[in-house]
């Protein structure tokens, strides 16, 4: 399974990413081993996930979510 996730950073911003293991990836973000964007913004909280059968579907959805406004992202959860 391939997943797209949205996490909320400690400063209130949102980060959207792709992974095959959501819990592991959130733990990596919280440990400071995630994306450069989240390293100074821990702890992070998981807000939204979507699952897909293919990596390409998940990556397309990740791109679409990243294009959304903050209000549109909040409407997801």
Swiss-Prot record:
Belongs to the UPF0213 family. This is UPF0213 protein VNG_2274C. CDD domains: GIY-YIG_UPF0213 (cd10456). It comes from the Archaea. InterPro entries: GIY-YIG_endonuc, GIY-YIG_endonuc_sf, UPF0213_domain. Residues 1-75 form the GIY-YIG domain. Pfam families: GIY-YIG.
